[in-house]
A protein has these predicted regions:
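Hot-dog-fold acyl-thioester-processing enzymes
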Residues: 1-88, 149-154
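HotDog/MaoC-like acyl-thioester-processing domains
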Residues: 1-3, 88, 93-154
Length: 154
């Protein structure tokens, strides 16, 4: 069954605050094999002009995917998550994510398109400090396989 087009433009409430810790940044950097000292050493980060260690750019996926839960668990959308694959991910950083940041994320359904029997769900995650400072915009495309009517075009 196709996804509900009326969800385009729907904004979900902000996530609970997420405090970015130095150890989480180190763990993520290790997991993606990013050896830059700015992710591990506060002095190296300060020498590079940052107030504390900074996260690798893709660290934002932790916050964006956490926020996506509101969309994918919304039964009214009609999404069967067992048929979903991740199609695309882009980040626009307004500033680096830093240790000590307290961030929240608001997600918006930007688009739903039917292609070749699949629905393409585009979700935008706006990551900000709890004070409202923009930090990152993450845009994800999820492919819901076999949900659209065959032959539908958006």
């Amino acid at each position: 069954m196709p996804l509900d087009q009326s969800f385009i433009g729907r904004e979900y409430p902000p996530t609970e605050p997420y405090e970015v810790g130095r150890e989480k940044i180190r763990e993520f950097a290790d997991a993606i094999k990013d050896g830059s000292p700015v992710h591990r050493d506060a002095d190296a980060a300060k020498a590079a002009g940052h107030p504390d260690v900074i996260a690798p750019p893709t660290f934002a996926v932790i916050l964006s995917m956490r926020a996506h839960d509101a969309v994918v668990s919304d039964a009214a959308l009609g999404l069967d998550y067992s048929k979903v694959v991740h199609g695309n991910q882009r980040f626009t950083h307004h500033r680096p994510i830093r240790a000590g940041d307290v961030l929240r994320t608001v997600v918006v359904v930007d688009d739903i398109k039917a292609r070749a029997g699949n629905d393409l769900l585009t979700v935008r995650a706006e990551i900000t400090t709890v004070g409202g400072e923009p930090v990152c915009t993450a845009i994800s495309t999820l492919v819901a396989r076999g949900t659209a009517e065959q032959g539908e075009q958006a």
